[in-house]
């Protein structure tokens, strides 16, 4: 025991024996002896009370009957060196009393106890408490715990004590931990039923309506606490005019496809939002220079090189729902590499590339519909090319730049529709090997090579194309020039990552700030070392709802998927 601890122990002994005590704390019929000087040193409340003539200097009593006796007694013991004995039952009372008496160290100790012991069983209780007493630190932490555990909490006895204002805040949050937006109406209905409160338009506006299945929308229509409110039915009748919604963070998985340095195996990585790290979920033997397309949560990899020196016609796939590889897919019509991959609602497309027979460029575009036994010829580009950007926008296939005859880049931009090819505004510079994505109704490209003659200059350019005005816009450049990077979009933000920079594989990622028009190195999406990212795709979680007929207990059926 150090000297200060010994001193406070002696003073506490004086208090217990009544020596030198000059104040009595009165709470109803209970009295607590203390010393004004000691209380003033620990409590801002007592310091002001005793030093600013709020009470007569000769007054021997302070009445605090509006406070909890046990909490005040525990805190005065704490001031005199006796540790707080905190439990889930008493910590709220002690914290609110410490806050009233302005005992800073006790407040911190109580807050730390709550934060350490916060869980799904007590988060609603602590959230309601923190909201009442305006404790932002606990309110924020308990709110985040509610978001994380929301599907457990819909059957919690305290769920009904959340206010409509709190439910609006919960249902509006991007971090609401649901893997499919259909669970959001389930959460809403559970709260309405537990409170027997009629629905409001403000609550319905919190749902991402454009992402809901028809069955769940019908469940909303038919529920008595919704259908009985005219304004709610009017709102639901006009959902076709609402803007498209962005998925919540937990309703998508960010999946990357690339080559790791472990003998250059194909690596499938999933981004862990909690840990802010990429985790490999599967891998298979070597392949490179292949095309990638995603349809119905299945990642298709077409052509490229495998372990032989020859190009491949094989197509393999990875099912992100079952975490399994698929090998029984019809082969391409001929071996090719450095081709482009796309998908619409029905077909997978393999575009251009280099043929195996004589390493010549090809202009052919083939397509395949899953469940069909073979690939079909679909169209031909105006000229053979490889390593071009490809994008699907408004039902049209766009082919951007690429390498043409003579190993030079091209600046051509063309689109393919049922009426054939159409030329558009050329790129500001000849480019190839760039990443491409459709975001917010525009085509974005980044990185790659750019040169008017020999293909050898690594680019950090970022461009966007507006198909309505047929014009290119140059955006802020990347911090790191990259060949074959991955460009992706989640939650209305653009990211670029991976690729090769100065012949070195880079594991860095960058995030685009649209308002400031700048790219920032992103510490949260750092890739594994020596990893070439071919593509990064947000995968939406799906449940077999589209195959299920609507019934009156459809929401109960949906509830059976919680935890799966």
Swiss-Prot record:
<comment type="subunit">
    <text>Interacts (via BTB domain) with host CUL3.</text>
</comment>
<feature type="domain" description="BACK">
    <location>
        <begin position="123"/>
        <end position="219"/>
    </location>
</feature>
<dbReference type="Pfam" id="PF01344">
    <property type="entry name" value="Kelch_1"/>
</dbReference>
<feature type="repeat" description="Kelch 3">
    <location>
        <begin position="347"/>
        <end position="395"/>
    </location>
</feature>
<dbReference type="InterPro" id="IPR011333">
    <property type="entry name" value="SKP1/BTB/POZ_sf"/>
</dbReference>
<keyword id="KW-0833">Ubl conjugation pathway</keyword>
<keyword id="KW-1123">Modulation of host E3 ubiquitin ligases by virus</keyword>
<dbReference type="InterPro" id="IPR006652">
    <property type="entry name" value="Kelch_1"/>
</dbReference>
<dbReference type="InterPro" id="IPR024182">
    <property type="entry name" value="Vaccinia_A55R"/>
</dbReference>
<keyword id="KW-1035">Host cytoplasm</keyword>
<dbReference type="GO" id="GO:0030430">
    <property type="term" value="C:host cell cytoplasm"/>
</dbReference>
<keyword id="KW-0945">Host-virus interaction</keyword>
<feature type="repeat" description="Kelch 2">
    <location>
        <begin position="298"/>
        <end position="346"/>
    </location>
</feature>
<dbReference type="InterPro" id="IPR015915">
    <property type="entry name" value="Kelch-typ_b-propeller"/>
</dbReference>
<dbReference type="Pfam" id="PF07707">
    <property type="entry name" value="BACK"/>
</dbReference>
<dbReference type="Pfam" id="PF00651">
    <property type="entry name" value="BTB"/>
</dbReference>
<comment type="function">
    <text>Probable substrate-specific adapter of CUL3-containing E3 ubiquitin-protein ligases which mediate the ubiquitination and subsequent proteasomal degradation of host target proteins.</text>
</comment>
<feature type="repeat" description="Kelch 5">
    <location>
        <begin position="442"/>
        <end position="492"/>
    </location>
</feature>
<keyword id="KW-1130">Modulation of host ubiquitin pathway by virus</keyword>
<feature type="repeat" description="Kelch 4">
    <location>
        <begin position="397"/>
        <end position="441"/>
    </location>
</feature>
<keyword id="KW-0677">Repeat</keyword>
<dbReference type="GO" id="GO:0039648">
    <property type="term" value="P:symbiont-mediated perturbation of host ubiquitin-like protein modification"/>
</dbReference>
<dbReference type="InterPro" id="IPR011705">
    <property type="entry name" value="BACK"/>
</dbReference>
<feature type="repeat" description="Kelch 1">
    <location>
        <begin position="252"/>
        <end position="297"/>
    </location>
</feature>
<protein>
    <recommendedName>
        <fullName>Kelch repeat and BTB domain-containing protein 1</fullName>
    </recommendedName>
</protein>
<keyword id="KW-0880">Kelch repeat</keyword>
<feature type="domain" description="BTB">
    <location>
        <begin position="21"/>
        <end position="88"/>
    </location>
</feature>
<dbReference type="InterPro" id="IPR000210">
    <property type="entry name" value="BTB/POZ_dom"/>
</dbReference>
